[in-house]
Swiss-Prot record:
A Gene Ontology cellular-component term: nucleus
A Pfam family that the UniProt record links to this protein: AP2
Taxonomic source organism: Oryza sativa subsp. japonica
Organism ancestry: Eukaryota, Viridiplantae, Streptophyta, Embryophyta, Tracheophyta
Protein name (record): Dehydration-responsive element-binding protein 1G
Keywords: Activator, DNA-binding, Nucleus, Stress response, Transcription, Transcription regulation
SMART domains from the UniProt entry: AP2 (SM00380)
Database matches in InterPro entries: AP2/ERF_dom, AP2/ERF_dom_sf, DNA-bd_dom_sf, DRE1A-I
């Protein structure tokens, strides 16, 4: 009988894993970071500021983001579990992977993880462990807090202000004012251009009618 195939079949069908079954009887307790804190290696400076001060296997990647990875029991290969929004979500993902890889020898962040989380059987593939870790983290996603609600309100208020400004800019009243300013400038331009044009000749001007053809067009204002 193929043991690995049977374990995979049990996990896919939703059958509780042996780890969870043993945890229900309460025969023995798992180690946790509070009862058996992990030893910190000396000389490591790269991750000192990014490692979580309490949770095992959790590091800060960016502001507001936490990453988690675990090491295989008998090897140097690490299993990347993903990036999470909170440190608790990453810590729950770590517990699932640690239980799947080490069983009773796992050091957990939470004592209730074997009871509350769905753990794949020991010997599961890396992909199965990642999927179980993602499900566990999602189950502990916190609800939106007040700060997120305040941010959404501020964004909505900013959008309303921009919309009002656009409505005022497109109002017909402002278009009329712009047209009036244009007409005023055009009037000044017409006046400046008119000063450069000679005035029309007046009646009785000696200069008028000096030509031979001008007599026919002369207008007599007074007749005796």
């Amino acid at each position: 009988m193929d043991v690995s195939a049977a374990l995979s079949s049990d996990y896919s069908s939703g059958t509780p894993s042996p780890v969870a079954a043993d945890a229900d009887d309460g025969s023995s307790a798992y180690m946790t970071v509070s009862s058996a804190p992990p030893k910190r290696r000396a000389g490591r400076t790269k991750f000192k500021e990014t490692r979580h001060p309490v949770f095992k296997g959790v590091r800060r990647r960016n502001p507001g983001r936490w990453v988690c990875e675990v090491r295989e029991p008998h090897g140097k290969q690490r299993i990347w579990l993903g990036t999470f929004e909170t440190a608790e979500m990453a810590a729950r993902a770590h517990d699932v992977a640690a239980l799947a890889l080490r069983g009773r020898a796992a050091c957990l962040n939470f004592a209730d993880s074997p009871r509350r989380l769905r753990v794949p059987p020991i010997g599961a593939s890396h992909d199965d462990i990642r999927r179980a870790a993602a499900e566990a983290a999602e189950a502990f996603r916190p609800p939106p807090d007040e700060s997120n609600a305040a941010t959404e309100v501020a964004a909505a208020a900013s959008g309303a202000t921009n919309s009002n400004a656009e409505q005022f800019a497109s109002h017909p009243y402002y278009e009329v004012m712009d047209d009036g300013l244009d007409l005023g400038m055009q009037g000044y331009l017409d006046m400046a251009q008119g000063m450069l044009i000679d005035p029309p000749p007046m009646a009785g001007d000696p200069a008028v009618g000096s030509g031979e053809d001008d007599n026919d067009g002369e207008v007599q204002l007074w007749s005796y």
